[in-house]
């Protein structure tokens, strides 16, 4: 991924493909959370969803908290290629857009999983429905308004 810096802004231009590199000996990349200044654990769920659309495989290792990867079954139902190894580790096999995620109905179990499911729904074909959005609202104020301004098509319903 090519990244540009403009003052305090990080610019990520459009890429046709995102590739997850592997090591020379064939082992796959590992993304693991760590205390500051390491990778914040709140981003692992989002990175897991992004990896489903990349080319290559990655091991997501949630070291700091229990049971934060238990939402991956919903992504698997959407067509993602993910192997849940244990409560702390999941292997994502990115399909480089060859397999499009399918829309579905899901429930947001918490803030982090909720935003990850929302991102997955935005990349899916069809209309998805996410219940228990109060979880997402706790961490992301006016999220549908802000994403709609970027081109998303999100509608909040009362039922």
Describe each PLM feature range.
Residues 1-159:
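Short, structured segments at the rim of ligand-binding sites
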């Amino acid at each position: 991924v090519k990244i540009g810096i403009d003052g305090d802004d990080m610019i990520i231009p459009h890429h046709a493909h995102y590739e997850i590199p592997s090591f020379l000996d064939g082992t796959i990349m590992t993304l693991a959370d760590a205390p500051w200044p390491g990778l914040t654990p709140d981003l692992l769920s989002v990175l897991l969803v992004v990896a489903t659309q990349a080319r290559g495989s990655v091991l997501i290792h949630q070291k700091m908290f229990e049971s934060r990867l238990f939402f991956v079954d919903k992504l698997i139902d959407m067509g993602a290629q993910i192997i849940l190894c244990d409560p702390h580790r999941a292997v994502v096999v990115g399909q480089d857009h060859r397999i499009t995620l399918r829309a579905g109905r899901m429930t947001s179990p918490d803030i982090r999983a909720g935003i990850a499911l929302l991102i997955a729904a935005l990349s899916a074909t069809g209309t998805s429905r996410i219940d228990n959005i109060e979880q997402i609202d706790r961490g992301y104020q006016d999220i549908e308004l802000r994403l709609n301004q970027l081109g998303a098509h999100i509608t909040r319903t009362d039922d």
